[in-house]
Every structure is written in C-alpha cells, then in structure tokens.
C-alpha cells in the first residue's frame, strides 16, 4: 500500500511539474526559433540594403502610384543608392559598403530608418538588421531617433489610411509627408557624419554638401521622386567621385555638358549655404513664395527643366523668380 501511494505521489508530481514547466520551456523554444528564422539583412552589404528598398517599394503600392507602382516616390531613394554605388561613392569592397563612406552613412538614414518604421507599422516583413559597433547606426526601432522615426511613421500611416479607406490617394499630400521625413533623416545624418564628410576630397565634399542642401530646395516644391523622374536625373549626375583637381567642372573632359552643369550648380549651392544668413534668407523666401500656387508651379517647372536638362544658372533663375516674378 505504501509503495503504491509513493508511486501515485511521484506520478502526480511529474504531471504537475510537466504542466507548470513544460509550457514555459516550449514557449522559450518557440521564441528562440522565431528569432532564428527571422530573415537577416546586413545593411553594409550593398545587395542587402538594395533588397530592403525593393521590399519597401513593393509593400507600399497604392492606386495613386499606378498599376506598375512606378509613381511610388520611394523609387528615388533606391535609384540614388544605385547611382552612389555605380559612381564609386559607396567605396564598396567585396560587396560591402564602406562604413566610412559619407554617402553610405547618409543613405543609412534614408534606407534602414524608413524600413524600421514601415516594419513597426506592419507594412513590410519583420527582419533582423545586423548591427555594428557604432551607436549612430541603430538597428531596431527602439534604438533609433524617435523624432526621425515619427516623421516616417506619419508618412507610412498615410499609406495605411489610403488602403483602409479604399481611396486612390493624393500624391501631393503623400509627397509632403515623404519630404518631411526625408529632410528629417538628412538633417539628423548631416549632424552625425561630419567626420566622414571631411574624409572626402575637397571637391567631392563641395559637391556632396551642395547636394544635401539642394534636397531642401526640391523638397520645398514637393518634387516627385518617382521612378521615371529620378532615373532620368541619374543620367545627369557625375559618374565618378570628384577629386582635388576638379575645381572647375568645365575642365572635366570625361563628363557630359549636363553632368558638368550639375556639378557646377552643387558647387554654387555649397558656397551659398556656407553663409547661414544668406542661405536661410533664400530658403525662407523660397518657402514663402511656394505658398502661392502660381509661384510654386513656376519654380517647380524650372527645377524640372533643370533636372531634365541641367543648366549652370538654376540658382540665378530661382533668385530672379523670387525677386521679380512672384
């Protein structure tokens, strides 16, 4: 009897032990497996970062972007990244983007940050982003700058709202949210990566800084960064990095006339932006004038003409519009 009672108590203990502990054990295994099975992307491998762009673009298609999604304003980010690679600006070695590349560093805030935001909003698949030992390159939503993320959250929320409402969407409204997020990313990245900017050759630095400020100009007029527009622009951009001898773009024989004009324009914008008072006054006037629809369309038209067939006098043209025509 005593033996049977002992066996019974042992069995009862084992049953209770199993019910109490095995569930938690299985849960731990499940969580562990989920983490193991997450697709992993290394943002410092060019193809991985490029693929994240593709996922992001394909996952944000809405009617206003067209049946082929070519009007999606996120195409511009991927096409720019492709140009940066093609022109050697990512300083790729065996498929890896150089972590000291200013262009690659800046692009991180226009690729990984938007993806983490879209992932948080449930628009794209959950993935694991490989991190490096540098806190400037956050790899989880929680670790990233919340103000920068909030701007992207607002943009992606617009896409979610359009889908939920079953409407086509307003591309101008979407562009406003996209540009707010875009400028927020650039402003944050510009402050973080002055060290890698200073590693660039003098004239590449002038070009890069001018380019970053030119984005402020095209954002003001709600420029559409869809596939066809940015693809065409990519043909006008310098195909290689600039060196210390490229002070005068007209002397760069391997560049087309349009490419020389783009470089010259970015040099001018760099020089203009070096004087904060002058640049801030210019941007203030530009933003003020673009509130007028006629002025905004006029300025937008000139910028589109420039991007399709660059001329070396776009800044003078804009100043003329701002001071005389509006």
Swiss-Prot record:
This is Protein LEG1 homolog. Keywords: Glycoprotein, Secreted, Signal. Residues 1-22 form the signal peptide. Disulfide bonds: none annotated. InterPro entries: Leg1. It is found in: Secreted. Belongs to the LEG1 family. The gene is leg1. It holds the Pfam family Leg1. One of its GO terms (cellular component) is extracellular space. Glycans are attached at residues 58, 85, 165, 226, 245.
